[in-house]
């Protein structure tokens, strides 16, 4: 553990000068544009500020505020010392200065729901400018209003329940087996890397019909790895920096997408039905009036969204299950039952009915998302003055609904830092999943993750084949940390042992 923390701390120290320079540049530019210094007061006049009952809190250091403390590395199964101390001192709603802006931080389940349900009326999505610079101005992550609704509608139609059943379920199972069949008995490897390989190949296939293992697919994957390092780095566009390299990789990735688009347009113009490909690229070209730039950003952002969070959630599930043999046993029993029913039907592939029978599997998925918190918090901006629980939150301020703080709240979840999938078992006769209005792993409201059902399908199918065919243990100690996104410092090294078919059928 000490070595792990030392490694993470050294990375933080390496990036501190870059982060500080970026913040200084941002502050200098912003303050110069503001008149009368109102920026420092969140755009409120002294008279207005005097009438307001702002949440308690502190501004932190000049220029940098409390950003460094907020982003300090900590285990993914905790909210971190910064949040713990601030909640203890100020309560679940407090003010701070983060990412160069006056900010209200919410660890309150009710306020978080209120924020997500009032998207476009009182709040709007507001990610740092550098995110838009690297994902593209037409990325769904940064769009607001009608443009976001149009992009989201295209994604939802492509990921409809009909397509999930008929197209995506077989594809998910095929890509799962491609990964698992390559695992050698008693071999050791990075589970996180394998999860990334699985989700990337799946998304590349369904976005642009790129097959796993092909040279172009592997080249795209390498560029994507460089691209991702820049997404989580300081936004300094200087030669040699991760952000600069990521922008170059973005251009290379867009070049691949653009070539695929040109090839597809040519095929469509010839009306060659034999070469029609049922992927997102074809869907966007035929089902929308999007411009070329919009399609490029849409495909890049969905490659990012559909790969990164799903792979981390899957790695977290493997990690949590390794430490809970009882859950693995119940999971295996559920999937042995499904496999037996498959054989009785004379089938060898999963059906949609099989998927809907994975009740305990969904409990495991929910608990993984609750405890691991792949998406820790969301960036929002207040667009109208808000009054909530006696506090005034001024228009123009940033507000961060911290989903992880709610999911790890002991007043909402008993023993919240323990992996307990049984907490999601319904106590009713229906045998379904227990519901919780405070559980928001995919966000909510009009910006609810368009790929949430696909993400759950991916995890369920992968776990089905994993527990039927393998046992596993950690090859060396590792655990997920937040820095600033969730990651395993060592890549989650595991050793796998294949289960004999006779054992599987018992």
Swiss-Prot record:
Principal place of residence:
membrane
Decide whether keyword ATP-binding is in the record: no
Provide the top EC class: oxidoreductase
- Kindly list the biological process annotations in GO that this record carries: brassinosteroid biosynthetic process; brassinosteroid homeostasis; jasmonic acid mediated signaling pathway; leaf shaping; response to brassinosteroid; sterol metabolic process; unidimensional cell growth
Binding, heme: 449
Pfam families from the entry? p450 (PF00067)
Q: What molecular functions are annotated in GO for this chain?
A: fatty acid 2-hydroxylase activity; heme binding; iron ion binding
The GO cellular component terms are: endoplasmic reticulum; membrane
Q: Which reaction does it catalyse?
A: a C28-steroid + reduced [NADPH--hemoprotein reductase] + O2 = a (22S)-22-hydroxy C28-steroid + oxidized [NADPH--hemoprotein reductase] + H2O + H(+); campesterol + reduced [NADPH--hemoprotein reductase] + O2 = (22S)-22-hydroxycampesterol + oxidized [NADPH--hemoprotein reductase] + H2O + H(+); campestanol + reduced [NADPH--hemoprotein reductase] + O2 = 6-deoxycathasterone + oxidized [NADPH--hemoprotein reductase] + H2O + H(+)
Q: What is its EC number?
A: 1.14.14.178
Annotated membrane topology: Single-pass membrane protein
Its localization reads: Membrane
Which coenzymes or cofactors are required? Answer: heme
Q: Which UniProt keywords apply?
A: Iron, Membrane, Metal-binding, Oxidoreductase, Transmembrane, Transmembrane helix
| Superkingdom to which the source organism belongs | Eukaryota
For this UniProt entry, which segments traverse the membrane?
12-32
SUPFAM superfamilies per UniProt: Cytochrome P450
**What does the record give as its pathway?**
Plant hormone biosynthesis; brassinosteroid biosynthesis
Family, according to the entry, reads as follows:
Belongs to the cytochrome P450 family.
Function in brief? Catalyzes the C22-alpha-hydroxylation step in brassinosteroid biosynthesis, which is the rate-limiting step in this biosynthetic pathway. Catalyzes the conversion of campesterol (CR) to (22S)-22-hydroxycampesterol (22-OHCR, 22-hydroxyCR) and of campestanol (CN) to 6-deoxocathasterone (6-deoxoCT).
Can you say what this protein is called?
Answer: Steroid (22S)-hydroxylase
Q: Which organism is it from?
A: Oryza sativa subsp. indica (Rice)
Gene behind this protein: CYP90B2
């Amino acid at each position: 553990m000490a070595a792990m923390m030392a490694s993470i701390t050294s990375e933080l120290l390496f990036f501190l000068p870059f982060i500080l320079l970026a913040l200084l540049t941002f502050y200098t530019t912003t303050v110069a544009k503001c008149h009368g210094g109102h920026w420092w007061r969140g755009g409120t006049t002294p008279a207005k500020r005097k009438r307001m009952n702002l949440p308690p809190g502190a501004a932190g250091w000049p220029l940098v505020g409390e950003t460094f403390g907020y982003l300090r590395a900590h285990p993914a199964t905790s909210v971190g010392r910064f949040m713990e101390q601030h909640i203890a001192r100020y309560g679940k709603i407090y003010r701070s200065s983060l990412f160069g802006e006056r900010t209200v931080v919410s660890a309150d389940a009710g306020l978080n729901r209120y924020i997500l349900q009032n998207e476009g009326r009182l709040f709007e999505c507001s990610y740092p400018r550098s995110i838009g610079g690297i994902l593209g101005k037409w990325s769904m992550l940064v769009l607001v209003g009608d443009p976001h609704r149009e992009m989201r509608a295209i994604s939802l139609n492509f990921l409809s329940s009909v397509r999930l059943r008929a197209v995506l379920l077989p594809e998910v199972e095929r890509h799962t087996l491609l990964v698992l069949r390559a695992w050698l008995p008693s071999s050791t490897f990075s589970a996180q890397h394998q999860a990334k390989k699985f989700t990337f190949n799946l998304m590349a296939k369904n976005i642009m019909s790129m097959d796993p293992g092909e040279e172009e697919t592997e080249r795209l994957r390498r560029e994507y790895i460089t691209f991702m390092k820049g997404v989580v780095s300081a936004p300094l566009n200087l030669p040699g920096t991760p952000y600069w390299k990521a922008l170059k990789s973005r251009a290379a990735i867009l070049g691949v997408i653009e070539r695929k688009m040109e090839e597809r347009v040519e095929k469509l113009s010839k009306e060659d039905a034999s070469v029609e490909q049922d992927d997102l690229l074809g869907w966007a070209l035929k089902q929308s009036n999007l411009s070329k730039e919009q399609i490029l950003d849409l495909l890049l952002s969905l490659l990012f969204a559909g790969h990164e969070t799903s792979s981390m959630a899957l790695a977290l599930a493997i990690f949590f299950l390794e430490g809970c043999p009882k859950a693995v046993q119940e999971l295996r029993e559920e999937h042995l039952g499904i496999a037996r029913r498959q054989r009785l039907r004379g089938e060898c592939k999963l059906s949609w009915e099989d998927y809907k029978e994975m009740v305990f599997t969904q409990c495991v998925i929910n608990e993984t998302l609750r405890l691991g918190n792949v998406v820790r918090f969301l960036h929002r901006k207040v667009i109208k003055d808000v009054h909530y629980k006696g506090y005034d939150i001024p228009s123009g301020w940033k507000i961060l609904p911290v989903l992880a703080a709610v999911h790890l709240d002991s007043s909402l979840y008993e023993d919240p830092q323990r992996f307990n999938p049984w907490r999601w078992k319904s106590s009713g006769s229906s045998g379904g999943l227990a519901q919780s209005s405070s559980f928001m792993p995919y966000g909510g409201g009009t910006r609810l993750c368009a790929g949430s059902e696909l993400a759950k399908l991916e995890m369920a199918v992968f776990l089905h084949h994993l527990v039927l065919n393998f046992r596993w243990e950690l090859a060396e100690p590792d655990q997920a940390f937040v820095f600033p996104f969730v990651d395993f410092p060592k890549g989650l090294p595991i050793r796998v042992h294949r289960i004999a078919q006779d054992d599987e059928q018992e």
